[in-house]
Amino acid sequence: MIEIEKVREIVERVARDYGLEVVEVEFRGGGKARMLRITIDKPEGVTHDDCSHVSNEVSTILDVEDVVPGASYTLEVSSPGLDRKISKPADFERFTGSLVKVSTREPLDGNRHFEGRLESFADGKLTIDLNAVPQRGQKKQKGPKAPVVERKVEIALADVEKANLVPEI
């Protein structure tokens, strides 16, 4: 049995030495297809060297301490990508001002999916400005523009099922 918490402790310790944040540690698959996927980040972006250092050190420690017993596994270390998952309070604080896509556990005003600009995060609640992007089913208006109605939604972090950044290209 793999002790995922023990693995996470090792990954956190190694990442901290390089000034990196651990976004996610997960095991996937079974048998010969087992994969340990580690996602790391830092404000100025993750480099290939960052991934290489973490991969080499974590691999050595896991092998020496025999934390992952049995068959072989593949170790993958990567950055979170442009559409990274955000879940911790620190993530929402860091990415205030960014475009986000959020799914809630229960419907709010008849919807579970919201996309817009993360306006703020305070007291465990995020505020999303829905005017930042056209919403599903919303059509572009032709002719004279109607007055813009501010559309915002406030969601408690505990109600967030999934949240990701939306790349702005």
Swiss-Prot record:
Ranges in coiled-coil conformation: none
Keywords of this entry: Cytoplasm, Ribosome biogenesis
Cytoplasm found in the keyword field: yes
Principal place of residence: cytoplasm
GO cellular component: cytosol
Subcellular location per the Swiss-Prot or TrEMBL entry: Cytoplasm
Any single biological process term in GO: ribosomal small subunit assembly
Similarity-based family: Belongs to the RimP family.
Matching HAMAP family: RimP
Function in brief: Required for maturation of 30S ribosomal subunits.
Name of the molecule in the record: Ribosome maturation factor RimP
